[in-house]
Design a protein with these regions (language model features):
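Short coil-to-helix segment of the ABC ATPase nucleotide-binding domain corresponding to the Q-loop/switch region
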Residues: 108-117
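The feature captures the beta-strand-to-loop junction immediately N-terminal to the Walker
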Residues: 39-41
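Helix-to-loop junction immediately C-terminal to a conserved catalytic motif
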Residues: 54
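ABC-family P-loop ATPase nucleotide-binding domain
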Residues: 1-14
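Conserved ABC ATPase "signature" region
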Residues: 69-83, 116, 127-145
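ATP-binding/catalytic-site motifs of ATP-hydrolyzing domains
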Residues: 63-65, 69
C-alpha cells in the first residue's frame, strides 16, 4: 500500500525521559475512517505516543506523515525533534482528532468556551470562526442551548 493510502503514518517513534525509554521505535498507520484504540497498562506510553504524533511532546526519533504530507522535523535541543515550519505543524494538527483518556474541562467556563479553547489557542483559528463552528456542531448534537 502506498503512503498516500494512509491518512496517518507515525514510523519509528522514540521517546525517552532520561534513561527511561518509553517509546522504542513505535509505528502506527491509519487509513481514512479508521478508529484506533491504544490499550495498555498505566505508564505504557499510550498518551506519550499520541502527544508525540501531534508534537505536544517531542520525540527523539521518528517520522510523521499526515494525509500524504511528511512533517518536516529537525534535531532540536536535548536531542528532541522540532518542526522546521510551525505553520506546517499547525495545519497538520487541524487534520488530526485525538481523544485522551483524561481530558480537562474548565468548570468556570461555559460549554462553548471549553469547546473553542483548542481551536483558538492550539490551531490558531479566530475566535469568531471557532464560535461559529462550535455552534454548528452543538446544534448537530442537540446542544445548541
Amino acid at each position: 500500500m502506498t503512503s498516500t493510502a494512509y491518512k496517518l503514518q507515525a514510523e519509528g517513534i522514540h521517546k525517552s525521559y532520561g534513561s527511561n525509554h518509553v517509546l522504542k521505535g513505535v509505528t502506527l498507520t491509519a487509513k481514512a475512517g479508521d478508529v484506533i484504540s491504544l490499550i495498555g497498562s498505566s505508564g505504557s506510553g499510550k498518551s506519550t505516543l499520541l502527544r508525540c504524533i501531534n508534537l505536544l511532546e517531542k520525540p527523539q526519533q521518528g517520522r510523521i506523515v499526515v494525509a500524504g504530507e511528511e512533517l518536516q522535523l529537525k534535531p532540536g535541543r536535548n536531542g528532541e525533534l522540532e518542526p522546521v515550519n510551525p505553520k506546517q505543524l499547525q495545519m497538520m494538527r487541524t487534520k488530526l482528532a485525538m481523544v485522551f483518556q483524561h481530558f480537562n474541562l474548565w468548570a468556570h467556563k461555559t460549554v462553548l468556551q471549553n469547546i473553542i479553547e483548542a481551536p483558538v489557542h492550539v490551531l490558531g483559528i479566530s475566535k469568531d470562526e471557532a464560535v461559529e463552528r462550535a455552534r454548528k456542531y452543538l446544534k448537530l448534537v442537540g446542544l445548541e442551548n
